[in-house]
Amino acid sequence: MNKSQGSVSFTDVTVDFTQEEWEQLDPSQRILYMDVMLENYSNLLSVEVWKADDQMERDHRNPDEQARQFLILKNQTPIEERGDLFGKALNLNTDFVSLRQVPYKYDLYEKTLKYNSDLLNSNRSYAGKQTDECNEFGKALLYLKQEKTHSGVEYSEYNKSGKALSHKAAIFKHQKIKNLVQPFICTYCDKAFSFKSLLISHKRIHTGEKPYECNVCKKTFSHKANLIKHQRIHTGEKPFECPECGKAFTHQSNLIVHQRAHMEKKPYECSECGKTFAQKFELTTHQRIHTGERPYECNECAKTFFKKSNLIIHQKIHTGEKRYECSECGKSFIQNSQLIIHMRTHTGEKPYECTECGKTFSQRSTLRLHLRIHTGEKPYECSECGKAFSRKSRLSVHQRVHIGEKP
């Protein structure tokens, strides 16, 4: 590509966060950011290295020596001992240290290099720049490949070009970029994605495509992961084992629910019903069931709640907000927990097991109702005749007899 066509700089493929914004990202978002950024840099480098090589030949320099100078980190072993990184496109899987093995902070630069790309931004346009600028990028790149701090290299070595790397605040640029690079746009709803594979999966919500079929019952799925989960129903496979008691489960979520029984200590006991809780505030909230206290009121409809979280969830009914969308059928929900329960209709997952008969259920509430068969509990009593029922719905049906309404 000649210069008249324009060149792509590292800045063009860079997304930066302020320190405050970075601290708000959770670990999975940070890893995704690094996945995107390192892929961008490696792709750009694979193109720009050749441009640099052509430039060196035009300048009658020694290409091998220039390449060596570009990629060698000062005071480290020669590039020949590190493998042939020059002369081929860098491979994200082999030429960079695994992102999940790199800590979120390096000791370098007063522990402020939090996966930010400012080390690379000093090279505004790679092609045609001086060798020392190339070396600066090479140093930063190889630093990622090392799994330890280069204690033999002074801080000043990284600041030769006088770029904004000399103090802590300069590590984070003042851009207000809120989202990661998302170049793949859905033509149906304009939702954006970082990777093409995610866009392809998402489009199945609109097209209804379900390319993954169970070879036992012929049920189809839009995602392979859901098919794999579903097939465990047929195979009986239980890959998730509790390290405490050895009990195995079909799905990881089943194991997580089970492990709570081992992990939780519940020293706070309700004097009314004997139920125990891990924290005192949970007991206080629970006791409102017995006292009837409902301190949280909806300003739209005046409905009251004994938990603030229940009020917040309820208010979404008025706003119409449904943030959680099913990737299988596109149905959306107010709460993430509702989506999780709904997804089990697609996967067939039933994480709640009856300890009496082994029957499994997709919802905890359904298990509770089922347990009354074994315990004989009938908490719903007719005020007219005293007959008791295990379920409120059955009491409602029964009461129609007294008022003359046909069930």
From Swiss-Prot:
Region (Required for correct nuclear localization and exclusion from the nucleoli): 2-167
Pfam families the record matches: KRAB, zf-C2H2
GO annotation (BP), single: regulation of transcription by RNA polymerase II
Superkingdom of the source species: Eukaryota
Keywords for the protein's UniProt record, in alphabetical order: DNA-binding, Isopeptide bond, Metal-binding, Nucleus, Repeat, Transcription, Transcription regulation, Ubl conjugation, Zinc, Zinc-finger
C2H2-type zinc finger segments: 184-206, 212-234, 240-262, 268-290, 296-318, 324-346, 352-374, 380-402
Gene Ontology CC terms: nucleus
Domain KRAB intervals: 8-83
GO MF annotation: an example: zinc ion binding
Region (Does not affect nuclear localization pattern): 171-404
Coiled coil: none
CDD domains in the cross-refs: KRAB_A-box
Sites of the Glycyl lysine isopeptide (Lys-Gly) (interchain with G-Cter in SUMO2) crosslink: 74, 114, 145
Protein location: Nucleus
Annotated InterPro entries: KRAB (IPR001909), KRAB_dom_sf (IPR036051), Znf_C2H2_sf (IPR036236), Znf_C2H2_type (IPR013087)
Protein family (similarity comment): Belongs to the krueppel C2H2-type zinc-finger protein family.
PANTHER family, per database record: RB-ASSOCIATED KRAB ZINC FINGER PROTEIN-RELATED, ZINC FINGER PROTEIN
Function: May be involved in transcriptional regulation.
Name assigned to this protein: Zinc finger protein 1 homolog
Native source species: Homo sapiens (Human)
